[in-house]
Amino acid sequence: MLKELGAIPTRGRIVVDRNRITGGGVTAGIDFGLKLVALLKSRVYAEAVQLYLEYDPQPPFNAGSPEKAQPLARQFLKDMFAGMRANALATAKRAMQRLGA
């Protein structure tokens, strides 16, 4: 949907773009925080925070991105969210029209 709204989608969990930092995915919040600590303090500081949190993710399945998930799982989600995606896209397009974008 990002492409349809004029954005440039990327696969990065954390993306630094000029003065903006964004994170995607449910667990990316911790990754985002650690990256921010590294940028503001240092890598060693961020690693110490990671160690303190004992943040050592080991997901039980290797399906955390479209490239890694099996086709059946991708199609399952696509079908599940088809209506929501259509509504969200229509809402975003109406908002863009109101803003003159």
PLM segments and residue spans:
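Active-site-adjacent pocket-lining segments in enzyme domains
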Residues: M1-A101
